[in-house]
Amino acid sequence: MGIDLIAGGKSKKTKRTAPKSDDVYLKLLVKLYRFLVRRSNSNFNAVILKRLFMSKVNKAPLSLSRLVEFMTGKDDKIAVLVGTITDDLRVHEIPAMKVTALRFTERARARIEKAGGECLTFDQLALRAPLGQNTVLLRGPKNSREAVKHFGPAPGVPHSNTKPYVRHKGRKFEKARGKRKSRGFKV
């Protein structure tokens, strides 16, 4: 048994050409950035459009602490994130920043505005920086999700830091390795 090839060889890799979501506001942004990509020769707009198509997992949130870290010494620039900006209580003082994002959590928005900064939407950004001038394009940490901690070499093999799926955090479950016969080995 072979594989059925479409005329012209193997099937190409798939990539999104539109967002999966039915969010009408997202669709309006896609419409706007499609226009900008078509009419301007700007790579920035093409990247924004591609990221608007992405799934939620690939639009990782960014905390205020990381945002502050990335924006030090770039006071005149606008931070751009296709995703959510979340608050971080570990940061006590934040500088005045201009930030564009799809979403801001309530506290993050309040803190940015209180510090004298601005929270912009992507349609406002398109008016201010149609070609992405003076912007810093950022991404959140994709691999910080809880689920990702379980990926990798099997837990229990040497040098593996993979988190096991444990049904219970009790005394005799995965905590007892090396302490009882039934849990691997006993020393």
UniProtKB/Swiss-Prot annotation:
Keywords linked to the UniProt accession: Ribonucleoprotein, Ribosomal protein
Pfam family, one: Ribosomal_L18
Annotated Basic residues bias: 165-187
Entry GO MF terms: mRNA binding; structural constituent of ribosome
GO CC, one annotated term: plastid
GO biological process entries: translation
Signal peptide: none
Disordered as annotated region, ranges: 150-187
InterPro entries: Ribosomal_eL18 (IPR000039), Ribosomal_uL15/eL18 (IPR021131), Ribosomal_uL15/eL18_sf (IPR036227)
Family: Belongs to the eukaryotic ribosomal protein eL18 family.
PANTHER family: 60S RIBOSOMAL PROTEIN L18, LARGE RIBOSOMAL SUBUNIT PROTEIN EL18X-RELATED
The protein's name in its UniProt record: Large ribosomal subunit protein eL18x
